[in-house]
Amino acid sequence: MITKLKSAVALYMIYRTLRDNPEKDIKYIYFSLELSSELLLAKLMCLYMYEEFGIVISYTELMSWEEILSDEKYEYIQKSRAWLSEISEKLLIFDKALTAKSFYRTVKGLLSEWGTFTKSADGRRELYQKDNPDQYVIVVVDHVGLCVPETGSSKKQEIDTISQYAVGLRERCQVSFFMLQQENRNSSNMDRRKMDMTECSSEDLKDTGNTYND
């Protein structure tokens, strides 16, 4: 249930941002390690139909091969597809296995399409210049605990490397990162909750707390 909730919160954040700011140059890079891109888009379409037309269609109904939709519902689906087409260049979903290397390669590759990497005068630093200074780039990893460790690397090491890459890109390229991560279900965490200490700390996170500190 918690897993579904955090994905739902992330998806609604994306929906709200794109829906409310159609004129802004916003790029979402979404690494969905739990849900397929088709399912995410279906959920976005359902949100749009409900808010725009007041029509309630579940994503299971939308994706079903057996469900026969009414002509009215089909018409609203077609209208909603037009909105999905509008945001297709703003929301880039990757739902395949993720390693630290593929994470860095994908994000930097897209940034190269939206700007230019150059070396500093002394050749010691890499600099980045956006093509559009007003562009917002937001990277979401849902969730980072499902990354795949490279050979010889532990899950913690892989997540820590992803976090290190994110910090470097954040500082160099002005990119925002949302690393969704599961909490530990240990006794100390439960004791803290009983004392109404509900704010998350690095010790509460599963696999590694470095994502919190970074």
Protein language model features and the residues they cover:
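Hydrophobic positions on the alpha1 helix immediately C-terminal to the Walker A/P-loop
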Residues: 5-9, 13, 40
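Cytosolic-facing regulatory segments adjacent to core modules
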Residues: 19-134
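Helical hairpin unit composed of two closely spaced alpha helices linked by a short loop
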Residues: 122, 126-167
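The conserved Walker
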Residues: 1-2
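Phosphate-binding/switch region of NTP-binding enzymes
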Residues: 162-214
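Short secondary-structure boundary/capping segments
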Residues: 44-50, 155, 192-198
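Generic enzyme active-site microenvironment
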Residues: 32, 140, 180
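Switch/connector loops and helix/strand junctions flanking conserved nucleotide-binding motifs
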Residues: 36-42, 53, 147-150, 186-190
